[in-house]
Amino acid sequence: GADCVVKQEDAEWDERAVRIYHNAKPGENYCPAGEDFSAGDLLAEAGTPVDSYLLAAVTAAGVRNLTVYKRLKAAVITTGDELQNTETPLQPGKIYDANGIWLCTRLREMDCEVVRYQTAGDDQSKIADEIREAWKEADLILTTGGVSVGEKDLLPGVIENLTGNVLFHGIQVKPGMPTMLSMVKGTPVLSLSGN
């Protein structure tokens, strides 16, 4: 029949009596069942990243098993002889590889693990080698540049030589019309325009 709880530090007791040194109020220091959540409450939406708070909540609720998905592992391969990293002063006729840096950063912001980031220039065999290396560890490969119809747009030929299956090549959006999606050895390769 109690309606409150008195903290131990606010009382003294022995075998015969308890002495309380302040006026206790109804509901004081009392946590009703279901205070954190009730039966049937949604603890997390599908797709919520699992962190220490979520694990504590589901443990408190008695949840023993969760269906989870691993973090997506992505590889980024940029193409173009004009690309240069930012570690050296910009050379004439070159540009810094801003697309590669942006893609890697954006993927990490979306909780993906970037397992590989390489620049392959305009070299068909190097691009193919980079894709071969990437599919060993990545769930998704993103490429930039070399996907249109110019002399140095090598990606369509590289994908064909790797016996890739092109799912589409070209979308109705500007910029980015030559975007291509293909499957190579079971790994999706999303090829984006370099511009």
Where are the model-predicted features located?
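Short, glycine/charged-enriched hinge/interface segments at domain edges or termini
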Residues: G1-R116
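Short glycine/threonine-rich loop/turn motifs
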Residues: K94, G100, D111-G194
